[in-house]
Amino acid sequence: MLSVGGGRSAVCRAVIATSIVWLLIDVVILFYYLDPSTSQQQPFPEDNRILNRARRIEPLPPAAQHDSDPDAHPIQPEKQEKQVYPVDKETANQLRKLMETQAFGPGYHGQGGTGVTVPEDKKTIKEKRFLENQFNVVASEMISVNRTLPDYRSDACRTSGNNLKTAGMPKTSIIIVFHNEAWTTLLRTLHSVINRSPRHLLEEIILVDDKSDRDYLVKPLDSYIKMFPIPIHLVHLENRSGLIRARLTGSEMAKGKILLFLDAHVEVTDGWLEPLVSRVAEDRKRVVAPIIDVISDDTFEYVTASETTWGGFNWHLNFRWYAVPKRELNRRGSDRSMPIQTPTIAGGLFAIDKQFFYDIGSYDEGMQVWGGENLEISFRVWMCGGSLEIHPCSRVGHVFRKQTPYTFPGGTAKVIHHNAARTAEVWMDEYKAFFYKMVPAARNVEAGDVSERKKLRETLQCKSFKWYLENIYPEAPLPADFRSLGAIVNRFTEKCVDTNGKKDGQAPGIQACHGAGGNQAWSLTGKGEIRSDDLCLSSGHVYQIGSELKLERCSVSKINVKHVFVFDDQAGTLLHKKTGKCVTGADQRVTLDECGLGRKDQMWQLEGYQSP
């Protein structure tokens, strides 16, 4: 006969075992519907304890079933329900709590990429939890991890996709780095990749956990990913390493011939993978990025981005989106499915041949945490024999945050300046002066030893940065040909022309010279523009004697005649070519006035000026 204590113990063990079994059944049922060999329309059983609110689950049909190549067959995964994965009590409870609030089916908010509005009674918790990841976690939890999205591709891209033969293409390892990512955004990333990717093109997904401190990203995630129908590897880094080193960890593990880096809060769309893989397979020195659409950080609405934008950068070495210039549009012609050759990529999402990635030096391991690595690899690829493309037929939505939720050792600015300085020192030659003039604080940041990276550049016989500006990015805010760089100083008052932090359409001013660059950093280009980053001094739309000069966005292709000046170094005058008037510094204003011989308010010195 069992004792009372022993009986209770046996009952407890039975209850725990039953709970774990039910959890495994629940998860198995979920992933049964991710198996392409199963029906896509069957309802979940009525007694499904976790998903009983979603009476009918209709996961997105895997892209493998609609492969454009009739001879290509998806890899059939083993029947997941035949496998048993041990789950301890604590992990089982964590998974149950996570999945009770998790939406799987199509009957939830946000379908078709629409946004969601958080109910009034949840506004307080929404605002509190927004700080967790700097996006609306509550809204994300209201949206199915299998949410539907329209086919956003152009007709030309659909036609191109239907004609694309993917049989025999190399397999891809998808690498996703995360740190304290929200559960639902990470899962939505995984589900969308698996639902919308041909299985025969996927070698594996590699998740690199950069020292997260949230419990659900350890054992619960380990257990969850084992049920997916493709190999998913999860590595937990022992120390916070940053995006760059974490990606290197993932790339070293990768078995695929192509590496495809993704962020942890994205949603891929129909036909996203095939164009990227095909372009890299065609030329192993191509690096190809998708169009990056916007997922609202508040409502999670999916908003498509323009097909005619490309990546650039400014004097701060910040990545920027700009309109594709006419010369590139002309090269592409009327074919909307043709990739855009871009000077830089955003860096979060791109595909690259694995061997080429290592041949050209992978990532600069001297960089810290995150920031600037995208410009460094962009310059390196172009200057060392490769090319960069944005493919309009591949679209991936990305949750863009207004600020990072993460902390940086020594502060964000220090890390960003450190990384940018390494890029400037290794790749930008004499043009690094533009960065240091615009960001004087970077002069005080230690860039570290860059000798190995310079040796790499020499070994690869990479081209000069001037070549890059002249041949790849002639529209860059950094002029390939310039006459001066620095302050514009009145020779008698010793005061400087200053942007005063003004923007397009506003007027600069005159301030005491501080010698630190920044707002007082100007360049007289070989074409006669007076630039401060991507803003040019201009006579403005309406000119009259004594009117103030304006700041205007510099022209991308053809020089605007309103922006052209002629400097006489001997007389010190800056003549506005169109009006024939001289730049005049009166009080705190910068104006155009009648030129007068010996007028002290019209005598200027341009720092670093070199005559043509």
From Swiss-Prot:
SMART domains: RICIN (SM00458). Glycans are attached at residues 146, 239. The chain crosses the membrane at residues 14-34. One of its GO terms (molecular function) is metal ion binding. Its main location: Golgi. Pathway: Protein modification; protein glycosylation. Substrate binds at residues 210, 240, 370, 401, 406. One of its GO terms (biological process) is protein O-linked glycosylation. GO terms for cellular component: Golgi apparatus; Golgi membrane. The keyword Membrane applies. Its cofactor is Mn(2+). Keywords: Disulfide bond, Glycoprotein, Glycosyltransferase, Golgi apparatus, Lectin, Manganese, Membrane, Metal-binding, Signal-anchor, Transferase, Transmembrane, Transmembrane helix. Residues 61-86 are annotated as: Disordered. PROSITE patterns: RICIN_B_LECTIN (PS50231). Residues 66-86 have a biased composition (Basic and acidic residues). Residues 35-612 are lumenal. Mn(2+) binds at residues 263, 265, 398. Residues 478-607 form the Ricin B-type lectin domain. Belongs to the glycosyltransferase 2 family. GalNAc-T subfamily. This is Polypeptide N-acetylgalactosaminyltransferase 3. It comes from Caenorhabditis elegans.
